[in-house]
Amino acid sequence: MSKTQRSDGDAGSGVVTAHNVGRTYYMGEPVHALQNLSLALEEGSFTAVMGPSGSGKSTLMNMLGCLDTPDEGTVEIDGRSVGDLSGAQRAKLRGTKIGFVFQTFNLMPRLSAAENVTLPMVFNDVVDEGRRERAQTLLERVGLGDRLDHAPNELSGGQRQRVAIARALANEPTLILADEPTGNLDSETGADIMDLFEELHDEGRTILMVTHERHIAEHAERIVHLLDGELDYIEEFDSAGVEDGGPKTAQPTADESIGTSGGDAE
């Protein structure tokens, strides 16, 4: 396996770019969740992030998803510095550019599958007449065209995650952020969900996925490894052996870089 570690802070450019990002939380003693971290997500790329609890994975996802802002450095989405935006502007950017998929699905229990999918459209001021039709199209896309009016408690775990993926696609985001998307699923259902993520990637979606599971991470084009808040190494894969069932082959990274980072509480 090839490994690459760089700390020059030059992330290049992408759909989302972090430049020398730092984030410290104050809970008694300061916790340096991220330090001098740089990363670019290129359009259409599929990146997995791995590392033990406390390694900075969740903080990194929160920064790239405009759920938090750095103390140091900058995060840019489509060339716009997130730190220069107001809270309302960040919320608007988050709602239009980013789709989230969570381990616990985070569906509204009293709403139907279709109504859950329409929620991001409501917040994005999509006209009412088009919401139901788009929700139906998206649910059909994830194999739930016959479950539009089912409540979450009437769906299996895998079906609920499919609803969550459809919801993430509601506003045609530039980026999909997935936090342990198979963590609450059995292995067979998790494999089905990863097949769906691969289909989305094949369609040109940009995906960042946090996972603890190596076999899940290997669905990505590269794996960014964090350890104790710092970059451990980055793997990039070619397709050798994939079509005939063989393992992916790790290749050294040439252009991407991450600096060091501190730990966070997941």
Describe the predicted segments one by one:
Residues 13-219, 223-227:
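ABC family nucleotide-binding domain
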Residues 1-22, 232-266:
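ABC-family P-loop ATPase nucleotide-binding domain
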